[in-house]
């Protein structure tokens, strides 16, 4: 089962372009990857403009056969797009007028997380705008009612903490296999 997500970027005009991402959309997976490997405005924009994807790696990559054997290939490092790599239609990026509209429409296909890269208002050492990642989440109460965050929260710290938990569980599983 997938943890679905949306990945968006807020443009200077205030509008948001975004696309769907199917696998490992939780903050310790996709969120951590976004914080670690997707800081460049042009790279993120180019990736989103390729449309909906199965997964995001660390690079946009090249067209590749989705059904081919991927052992020993660069597949794990590349994004895998529905149109470019699988030949599917009607899976381009979407445009929203603002953050509220993005949140309102971001959970229509079973997404659990919606990510947004936006300008922090700060400048980097070269005087260029600094961008960082934010997220909103959809979760269910014990009564089964869906609750969706109404405002974006900073992603980086939460993504790192969740990624550390994932690594700890992996180490525990390795230790259990050694004992067995």
PLM segments and residue spans:
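Low-complexity intrinsically disordered segments
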Residues: 37-180
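An exposed acidic His-Trp-rich patch
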Residues: 31-37
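Short, extreme N-terminal segment that most often corresponds to the first beta-strand
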Residues: 1-26, 30
């Amino acid at each position: 089962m997938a943890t679905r997500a949306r990945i968006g970027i807020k443009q200077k005009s205030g509008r948001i372009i975004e696309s769907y991402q199917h696998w490992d959309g939780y903050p310790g997976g996709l969120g951590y990857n976004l914080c670690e490997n997707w800081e460049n405005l042009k790279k993120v924009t180019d990736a989103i403009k390729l449309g909906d994807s199965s997964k995001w790696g660390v690079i946009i990559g090249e067209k590749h056969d989705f059904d081919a054997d991927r052992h020993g290939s660069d597949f794990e490092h590349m994004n895998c797009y529905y149109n470019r790599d699988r030949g599917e239609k009607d899976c381009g990026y979407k445009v929203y007028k603002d953050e509220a509209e993005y949140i309102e429409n971001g959970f229509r296909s079973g997404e659990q997380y919606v990510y947004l890269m936006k300008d922090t208002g700060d400048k980097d050492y070269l005087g260029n705008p600094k961008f960082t990642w934010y997220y909103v989440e959809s979760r269910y109460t014990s009564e089964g009612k869906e609750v969706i965050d109404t405002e974006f929260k900073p992603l980086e710290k939460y993504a790192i903490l969740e990624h550390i938990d994932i690594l700890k569980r992996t180490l525990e599983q390795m230790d259990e296999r050694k004992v067995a």
